[in-house]
């Protein structure tokens, strides 16, 4: 007898990047920063009050949210902090996609999107890129939710934020713009996310690529 949910029994899990242990190998497969942290990071850690670790941290990350809000000219109430982008993607899928619903994304892209759809007992709907690897405009009713990776990974092609803004206005679901590589691009969609008229668009950032 299996106690596992029926829709999970066939699931093939997300395969993480290989972690080689051979001497002299240059590791590039998981897009990690090849440089060490700033010396200021070491100074901040050395000055950290270790006694505070015996208590739970602020569950709503107030200070971090206030700082991020000040950087982007928005309210702290518009900022959500997660334990990595994967957690935020998981919460996004569970919050905005019903069981049996659909989540759209371009293909090729980050393979976790489809895995999270299956975990939710939803259907992932890949939308193929154009022959030049640019992102085509998805239909406005393509899915219940859509993840637009910009710049795209793995192609690195960037879509003009104005095009994404136009899609968000016509799209009938919730749009998440995954900007994991935004720090390497000349423009981003943050102004779209913090705009007062925005009702269906979220922008996700990470510290794992450029920091």
Give the positions of each predicted feature.
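Short, well-ordered alpha-helices that flank and scaffold nucleotide-derived cofactor binding pockets
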Residues: 43-47, 70, 94, 98, ...
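N-terminal "arm"/small-domain region of PLP-dependent enzymes with the aminotransferase-like
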Residues: 1-55, 142
């Amino acid at each position: 007898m299996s106690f596992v949910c029926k829709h999970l029994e066939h699931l093939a899990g997300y395969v993480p990047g290989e972690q080689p242990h051979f001497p002299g190998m240059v590791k590039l497969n998981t897009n990690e920063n090849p440089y060490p942290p700033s010396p200021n990071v070491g100074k901040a850690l050395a000055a950290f009050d270790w006694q505070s670790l015996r208590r739970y941290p602020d569950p709503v990350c107030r200070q971090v949210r206030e700082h991020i809000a000040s950087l982007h000219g928005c309210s702290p109430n518009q900022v959500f902090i997660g334990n990595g982008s994967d957690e935020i993607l998981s919460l996004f899928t569970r919050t905005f996609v019903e069981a049996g619903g659909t989540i759209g994304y371009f293909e090729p892209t980050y393979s976790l999107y489809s895995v999270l759809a299956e975990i939710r007992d939803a259907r992932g709907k890949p939308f193929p890129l154009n022959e030049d690897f640019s992102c085509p405009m998805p239909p406005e009713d393509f899915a219940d939710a859509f993840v637009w990776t910009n710049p795209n990974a793995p192609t690195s092609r960037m879509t003009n934020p104005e095009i994404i803004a136009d899609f968000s206005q016509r799209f009938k679901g919730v749009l998440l713009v995954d900007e994991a590589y935004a720090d390497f691009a000349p423009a981003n969609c943050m102004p779209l996310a913090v705009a007062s008229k925005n009702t269906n668009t979220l922008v996700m950032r990470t510290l794992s690529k450029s920091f």
